[in-house]
Regions:
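Catalytic cores of the polymerase beta-like nucleotidyltransferase superfamily
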Residues: 1-346
Length: 346
């Protein structure tokens, strides 16, 4: 396995001083998937003060970035490396964070607390890949599986539910059945997680190649984090312009959209107003007049809850408000819309 030379140096310095050290988590997973390994986290048996002393003696800048959880950050040639002491977590509070952290000397204990088997591997050039939970096999078979008891993992940190969905979307992996069941059993715990953390995972999910399947299969989870979408799940569109119900249409437009987070978020929310304005004429044809304007206001409520940036808020709400307005496009209409809403929205 190839690691950035500075990561190798840090691991070697710790080994030379009698401590174990490994690259852990996502970088090991990505290497095995033959993907770029840009973000290397290091786990070690050395306590933070020992890590700091050893690396500073080698002329490396070290910052105390999370001492409570055993983390310091080393900076070499502009590259940042988080180095965390092996640990086991105490009881979790509110499905968010452990109340206590105990430092340990065994990499096995450290890996056992991690979320999914594909993220619970470690590596150094002396020992090779340490895989205690079948992560390599799950990578080979395209499976997302919780480490140990999935109910316990999700009760520890409910954001792991969104991480499972995100990995399934981005990697195209299937979520293992026991893990899937635990997701549905524990999805209400997402109400304990900050909206910003949920939005960060949702954005990554939307950018995945497998987003349509995940949004479909795990719609009940999406309904927990965006309850405004739930009326769309079974809202029929009986008219000549649609082959899916509202939610089916929504998720397929997400998949068809360019991989731009503003565009894909717009697609997720663009028809959210349809159930509120649905009417059916005497021929049994469904209509959704004013749904764009109504949907833009609902989307604003969703985005305020997620505390999105002003740029995302303005662009998404504007695109939703006007998404039904441009038909039979020609040069004159394009110029008119450029004048009305600005080039950034066209």
């Amino acid at each position: 396995m190839f690691l950035p030379k500075n990561a190798e140096k840090i691991i070697d310095f710790l080994y030379e001083n009698g401590y174990k050290a490994y690259a852990v988590g996502g970088c090991v997973r990505d290497f095995l998937l033959e993907k770029p390994c840009d973000d290397v986290d290091i786990a070690t048996s050395a306590l933070p003060d020992k890590v700091e002393r050893i690396l500073k003696d080698e002329g490396i800048k070290v910052f105390e970035t999370g001492l409570k959880h055993g983390t310091v950050t080393a900076v070499m040639d502009g590259e940042h490396y988080e180095i965390t002491t092996f640990r086991k977590d105490g009881d979790y509070k509110d499905s968010r964070r452990p109340e206590t952290v105990d430092f340990v000397t065994d990499i096995a204990e450290d890996l056992s607390r991690r979320d999914f088997t594909v993220n619970a591997m470690a590596y150094n050039h002396s020992e090779g890949i340490v895989d205690l939970f079948g992560g390599k096999e799950d990578l080979k078979n395209g499976i997302i599986r919780a480490v140990g008891d999935p109910d316990k993992r999700f009760n520890e940190d409910a954001l792991r539910i969104m991480r499972a969905l995100r990995f399934s979307s981005v990697l195209g992996f299937t979520i293992e059945e026991n893990t899937k069941k635990a997701i549905f059993d524990n999805m209400r715990l997402l109400n304990n997680i900050s909206a910003e953390r949920i939005f960060a995972e949702l954005t990554k999910l939307l950018m995945g190649d497998n987003a349509v399947s995940v949004l479909d299969e795990y719609r009940q989870v999406i309904g927990v984090i965006i309850p405004e979408l739930k009326p769309c799940f079974d809202c029929v569109q009986n008219n000549p312009w649609h082959i899916y119900n509202v939610y089916g249409h929504i998720i397929h437009t997400v998949g068809a959209a360019p991989k731009d987070k503003i565009i894909r978020l717009t697609m997720l929310l663009h028809d959210i107003g349809k159930p509120q304005v649905k009417t059916t004429d005497e021929k049994g044809i469904d209509h959704f007049k004013t749904h764009a304007a109504v949907g833009a206001e609902i989307a604003k409520t969703v985005m305020k809850r997620f505390k999105v940036s002003n740029e995302i808020y303005d662009k998404v709400s504007t695109l939703i408000h006007y998404h039904q307005s441009v038909e039979n496009v020609d040069d004159i209409r394009i110029k008119r819309w450029l004048s009305k809403i600005g080039e950034d929205y066209m």
